[in-house]
Amino acid sequence: MKNVTDSFVSLVHWPSAGSFGFNTDILATNPINLSVVLGVLIFFGKGVLSDLLDNRKQRILNTIRNSEELREGAIEQLEKARARLQDVQIEAEGYRAYGYFGIDEQRHESINSTYKTLEQLENNKNESIHFEQQRAINQVRQQIFQQALQGALGTLNSCLNNELHLRTISANIGLFGSMKELTD
């Protein structure tokens, strides 16, 4: 341990001529170097510090503005809440003056109105279901009719050949000829 301490002490007291060592004497350091370093720090640091302070000032001002706006909004909401409270208190006084009979009557009216509304909704639902069923039935009928018609046309087209077609035309001409003779 003593060797480590001795080596550190000898390093501190190392002769300054031609060698490197720690200079613990602050008065012996070069004042010009210190003043240059401090001058550079002050010159460049002043701008950075000024920008930091300006940014901080703007953030504080914005925070204050936002706080003022929030405070005004809160005051406005508080006034609305107070007005609503007064309205509710007046309404409550009216209910107290009207008595429980009026409240019970209003409750029955509300229940009856709700039942009527539900009944109307049920009727509307049933009508909608019936309408949709009829529409679906009509669509199915149309599709069946179209398929039957297409099937009949397909069958006729596949069964008719030129010879059968000519015989049918000749038979119809003969039928029309005999009908003409009867009418004359």
Curated annotation (Swiss-Prot):
InterPro entries: ATP_synth_b/b'su_bac/chlpt. The keyword Transmembrane applies. It comes from the Eukaryota. It is found in: Plastid, Chloroplast thylakoid membrane. Keywords: ATP synthesis, ATP-binding, CF(0), Chloroplast, Hydrogen ion transport, Ion transport, Membrane, Nucleotide-binding, Plastid, Thylakoid, Transmembrane, Transmembrane helix, Transport. The chain crosses the membrane at residues 27-49. GO terms for molecular function: ATP binding; proton-transporting ATP synthase activity, rotational mechanism. It comes from Oenothera elata subsp. hookeri (Hooker's evening primrose). This is ATP synthase subunit b, chloroplastic. It is a single-pass membrane protein. Pfam families: ATP-synt_B. F-type ATPases have 2 components, F(1) - the catalytic core - and F(0) - the membrane proton channel. F(1) has five subunits: alpha(3), beta(3), gamma(1), delta(1), epsilon(1). F(0) has four main subunits: a(1), b(1), b'(1) and c(10-14). The alpha and beta chains form an alternating ring which encloses part of the gamma chain. F(1) is attached to F(0) by a central stalk formed by the gamma and epsilon chains, while a peripheral stalk is formed by the delta, b and b' chains. GO terms for cellular component: chloroplast thylakoid membrane; proton-transporting ATP synthase complex. F(1)F(0) ATP synthase produces ATP from ADP in the presence of a proton or sodium gradient. F-type ATPases consist of two structural domains, F(1) containing the extramembraneous catalytic core and F(0) containing the membrane proton channel, linked together by a central stalk and a peripheral stalk. During catalysis, ATP synthesis in the catalytic domain of F(1) is coupled via a rotary mechanism of the central stalk subunits to proton translocation. Component of the F(0) channel, it forms part of the peripheral stalk, linking F(1) to F(0).
